[in-house]
Amino acid sequence: PLYEYLWAYNGDQMASELNMESKHSIEKQTAHHVDCFTTVSDITARECKELLDKPVDMVLPNGFENDFVPKDGTFTKKRKAARRHLLDVANALTGDDIQEDALIVSTSGRYEFRNKGIDVFIEAMNRLRFDESLQKQVVAFIEVPGWTAGPRQELAERLDSGRQFDTPLDMPVLTHWLHNMDDDNVLNRLRTLGMNNAKDDRVKLVFVPCYLTGDDGILNMSYYDLVLGNDLCVYPSYYE
């Protein structure tokens, strides 16, 4: 509905109604005074024209450099290591026997619950949980930085042991404790849907609420190394 009637919205008025005047003002003034104003998609170019009153000078390609993906044997080695670690984390959290051929799915980005489609991702995994035609296990990861209080010590100890586990931890959906456990959008949605990684759930969901810089205390791999372990990455952002 927003984009169908985008032409009818006034950016200044909407910012006032949504109590976002400061943020909107900085963005608008920047757009009007920079030497070159760009964006990375036609739809965000429309937003700029209608909401910031400033057409972009150029729409740039949105992608990665060619060397983003490791080549040949390096790719295979890194992918295998990432998959093994992701499956180990899932087992250590849930106590379930995660098969080697499990489908690993993830979404990531800024913690904008609706704007980045995190709500859609969770709902999709929940529907898949009840799909009787599902032939293999699915392990889904939400990798968005939240208000992290620190890595879960009991999870780190399980991972350090190198063992496989058949009993779950408390809160078997979360890798790092949060300061706002009762107010976190992802955790609240999982509670509402009853997604708690039960033993008989064919779809397991793991929330990783930290920056993946290689030293988070649980995954300890950079995002660009870890993402190689996925079979599918999903980015259902509202604005795209």
Predicted regions, residues:
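Catalytic cores of nucleotide-sugar-dependent glycosyltransferases that transfer UDP/GDP/TDP-activated
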Residues: 1-240
